[in-house]
């Protein structure tokens, strides 16, 4: 599908900020190119990947509004991961056990969420209103997205959680300013890495807390499919068009 999109349709930037500023390096895409950027989507990758993982699907997302969106795909730091025998790889936090309860390093996850807060702060400083910023993530990145968005101090546009789980549901201190934030959860019914039961558990937890959640299930494994990309585009168009 990428080949059908002219190269000039989107602008790609790679940003590397000073480490002492505690801003994560990231790949950026402004789409469609030439339109004034009025919204941002911060999209976190999964375990072992990097910010380039989801950047290629940007031209496939059909957005129905007449302004540009800045997609920001940060790179996770490389750390030892217990479930992979301590192998050092890009990860937002350590996973200690792959059982149904997902024993993870909560402090590392919260630290990653604080890095996302700084990316949000930077987008606001670039002129994007907080309620035009979506926080998204796949797998590990989705778990961080829940924590980052629900604890942020200003109202955000939404949370997009793909093939993930709500790792900090029992410890999170939700900022009431984002108590009604819209949430999109997408999950593969054949996912062997993050079973769909964890996606449904996130759904029930958030609904019990009063959140507006849209849930989609697809007959795929731990991946994103074309129908999911279409649903993502529709949801983003509604959320950013209404916010």
Regions found by a protein language model. Give the residues of each.
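Serine-hydrolase catalytic machinery in alpha/beta-hydrolase-like enzymes
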Residues: 20-131
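Primarily recognizes the serine-hydrolase "nucleophile elbow" in alpha/beta-hydrolase
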Residues: 124, 131-178
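A domain-start/cap signature at the N-terminus of enzymes
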Residues: 2-41, 52, 201-204, 213, ...
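C-terminal catalytic histidine-bearing segment of alpha/beta-hydrolase fold enzymes
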Residues: 197-243
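Conserved alpha/beta-hydrolase "nucleophile elbow" surrounding the catalytic nucleophile
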Residues: 45-47, 133-138, 188
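Short beta-strand/loop motif that positions the catalytic acidic residue
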Residues: 185-187, 191
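Short, proline-enriched alpha-helix->beta-strand connector loops that line the catalytic pocket
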Residues: 178-183, 211
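Short, conserved loop/helix-junction motifs that constitute active-site signature segments
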Residues: 63-66, 175-180
């Amino acid at each position: 599908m990428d080949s059908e999109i002219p190269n000039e349709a989107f602008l790609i930037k790679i940003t590397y900020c000073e480490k002492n500023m505690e801003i994560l390096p990231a790949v950026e895409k402004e789409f469609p190119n030439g339109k004034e950027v009025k919204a941002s989507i911060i999209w976190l990758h999964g375990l072992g990947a990097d910010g380039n993982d989801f950047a290629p699907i940007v031209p496939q997302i059909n957005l129905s509004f007449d302004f540009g969106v800045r997609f920001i795909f940060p790179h996770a730091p490389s750390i030892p991961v217990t479930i992979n025998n301590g192998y050092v790889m890009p990860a937002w936090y350590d996973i200690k056990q792959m059982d149904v309860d997902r024993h993870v390093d909560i402090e590392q996850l919260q630290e990653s969420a604080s890095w996302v807060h700084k990316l949000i702060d930077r987008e606001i400083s670039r002129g994007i209103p907080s309620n035009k910023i979506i926080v998204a993530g796949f797998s590990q990145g989705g778990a961080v997205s829940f924590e980052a968005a629900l604890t942020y101090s200003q109202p955000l546009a939404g949370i997009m959680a793909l093939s993930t789980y709500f790792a900090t549901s029992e410890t999170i201190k939700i900022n009431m300013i984002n108590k009604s934030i819209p949430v999109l959860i997408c999950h593969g019914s054949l996912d062997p890495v993050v079973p769909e039961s964890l996606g449904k558990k996130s759904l029930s937890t958030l609904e019990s807390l009063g959140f507006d959640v849209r849930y989609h299930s697809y007959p795929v494994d731990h991946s994103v499919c074309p129908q999911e990309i279409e649903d993502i585009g529709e949801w983003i168009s509604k959320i950013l068009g209404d916010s």
